[in-house]
């Protein structure tokens, strides 16, 4: 990244840090209120929404990037020194982009039909942060200001790990009824269509295939867009350096 990209990255990651922090504080406050004033059995199951988890991961990634970019500005270190953190940021961005598209394509239209889905609409309370602001800041910031080039093209499949771990934790909680018992909403699962006990087995499989497929598609799109942008910038920087050396001779 050149100085312009570094400053832009620092600004965007700082914005992500502040906006998601607000969402986290509000969510914690809501859970505390539910536990102490509504139902003492209520715990922190609201944090098992994929939206909340991916936003927290993005928040952590933004903190890492603020530190890394600041070090790059002052110490002139290259991306190679922090390649793993850039890949972590990539994974977090795919996760929040997934939630943005999922809500936009499914929950937003359903919210106009069913009152139950209005709670997760894109414009309701802090959802505007977790469903719109943070995902878009993360997406545009990563694609246009942060580059994690690698010759290993399978890197775009890494976001599947985040989705897999979420499913690995969610399914047992739903099947055993733990989520329904301790969540603030007392829904059977974080999302109605993820209720693996009520839904037909084939519906569950189709849902999982859709989620994995969408994650893979988003990962490929973001990765190769990022890679193309980096390649173009690298060629420009290389040509500029060659031109400078030639003029100095």
Regions found by a protein language model. Give the residues of each.
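Membrane-interface transmembrane-helix boundary segments in multi-pass integral membrane proteins
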Residues: 177-224
């Amino acid at each position: 990244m050149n100085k312009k990209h570094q400053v832009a990255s620092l600004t965007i990651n700082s914005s992500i840090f502040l906006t998601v922090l607000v969402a986290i504080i509000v969510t914690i406050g809501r859970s505390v209120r539910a536990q102490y004033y509504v139902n003492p059995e209520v715990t922190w199951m609201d944090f098992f929404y994929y939206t909340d988890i991916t936003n927290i991961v993005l928040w952590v990634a933004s903190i890492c990037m603020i530190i890394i970019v600041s070090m790059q500005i002052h110490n002139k270190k290259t991306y190679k020194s922090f390649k793993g953190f850039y890949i972590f940021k990539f994974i977090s961005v795919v996760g929040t982009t997934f939630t943005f598209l999922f809500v936009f394509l499914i929950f937003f239209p359903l919210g106009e039909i069913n009152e139950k889905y209005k709670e997760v609409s894109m414009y309701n309370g802090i959802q505007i942060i977790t469903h719109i602001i943070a995902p878009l800041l993360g997406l545009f910031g990563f694609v246009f200001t942060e580059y994690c080039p690698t010759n290993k093209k399978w890197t775009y499949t890494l976001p599947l790990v985040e989705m897999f771990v979420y499913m690995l934790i969610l399914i047992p909680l739903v099947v055993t009824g733990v989520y329904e018992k301790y969540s603030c909403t007392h829904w059977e699962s974080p999302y109605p269509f993820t209720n693996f006990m009520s839904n037909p087995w084939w519906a569950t499989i189709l849902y999982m295939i859709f989620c994995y497929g969408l994650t893979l598609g988003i990962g490929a799109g973001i990765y190769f867009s990022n890679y193309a942008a980096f390649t173009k910038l690298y060629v420009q920087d290389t040509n500029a350096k060659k031109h400078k050396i030639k003029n100095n001779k």
